[in-house]
Amino acid sequence: MSEITAAMVKELREKTGAGMMDCKKALAETAGDMEAAIDWLRAKGIAKADKKSGRTAAEGLIGVSSQGTKAVVVEVNSETDFVARNDAFQELVRGIAKVAVSTDGTVDAVAAATYPASGKSVSDTIKDAIATIGENMNLRRSVALSVEDGVVATYIHNAVSDGLGKLGVLVALKSTGDKEALNAIGRQVAMHIAATAPLAIRPEEVDAAVAERERNVFIEQSRASGKPDNIIEKMVDGRMRKFFEEVALLSQAFVINPDLTVAAAIKEAEKAVGAPIEVAGMARLLLGEGVEKEETDFAAEVAAAVKG
């Protein structure tokens, strides 16, 4: 069995919110497999699927920019929030987002593109900014969406400046209808995506591995009821239907009008748009998502628990 380290216990606790001893036991029961340990805790009712660590190392900004029927969202990290509030840094992120629209939107393509204000690549411009501002920074993520007919609506939650904030969303809507009305529903859907973080647009598009993992957790939880297998199967099927409704955009209750699903709200909007609307893509970037910062005092606490 793999050695259970303090760092592993710390990571599991941050991901699940479970107690240190529960995390240590979960890792021991699963031979140190982090994902399996998360599922073990969930099956025992100790952790929830959507528990996220609030400890993120990355500061910086999310930037959005659009041009015609294309838009991009980028994440540029800095070490401190102080730098993120710096006018020069904000202008840099805004400029990178504008450059990104003319590329295919991948990080490599954006990094290699020319930054007009410096005449250098975006990558080299960031290096110059590091020397000037005195803090490490990097282009971490970039996503572009485009449609032939329609709009790509953008949304920045709690914007700190024009097109800049901590959470950015794109949603691509295919339609030959009125662009102004299309942008209006697009912005509302983008706001909804910011609030709910759907995993996919449609239930059938949810990653099969994610769905299978949920089903296995539900099976273990249902077995604890002691009911026959045929009843357990029905219970699991019902919970899976609810799971898909909760994580797929179009089947979610629309945050702006919970009486409607997102699909129904879009259908309603077709009256004003004057043509059918199809959700062709979406992207949601939350600053620092998936990056953890060092918590030295807490690490010492975990180390004591592991030794115990």
From Swiss-Prot:
GO MF, any single term: translation elongation factor activity
Keywords from the named record: Cytoplasm, Elongation factor, Protein biosynthesis
Source superkingdom: Bacteria
UniProt xrefs under SUPFAM superfamilies: Elongation factor Ts (EF-Ts), dimerisation domain, UBA-like
One Gene Ontology cellular component annotation held by this UniProt entry: cytoplasm
InterPro entries: EF-Ts_dimer_sf, Transl_elong_EFTs/EF1B, Transl_elong_EFTs/EF1B_dimer, Transl_elong_Ts_CS, UBA-like_sf
Main location: cytoplasm
Record-annotated disulphide pairs: none
Pfam families reported in the protein's UniProt record: EF_TS (PF00889)
Gene3D superfamilies: 1.10.286.20, DNA helicase RuvA subunit, C-terminal domain (1.10.8.10), Elongation factor Ts, dimerisation domain (3.30.479.20)
Region (Involved in Mg(2+) ion dislocation from EF-Tu): 80-83
Stretches that traverse the bilayer: none
Keyword Signal: no
Family per similarity comment: Belongs to the EF-Ts family.
Role of this protein: Associates with the EF-Tu.GDP complex and induces the exchange of GDP to GTP. It remains bound to the aminoacyl-tRNA.EF-Tu.GTP complex up to the GTP hydrolysis stage on the ribosome.
Protein name: Elongation factor Ts
Organism expressing this protein natively: Rhizobium johnstonii (strain DSM 114642 / LMG 32736 / 3841) (Rhizobium leguminosarum bv. viciae)
Phylogenetic lineage: Bacteria, Pseudomonadati, Pseudomonadota, Alphaproteobacteria, Hyphomicrobiales
Gene (UniProt): tsf
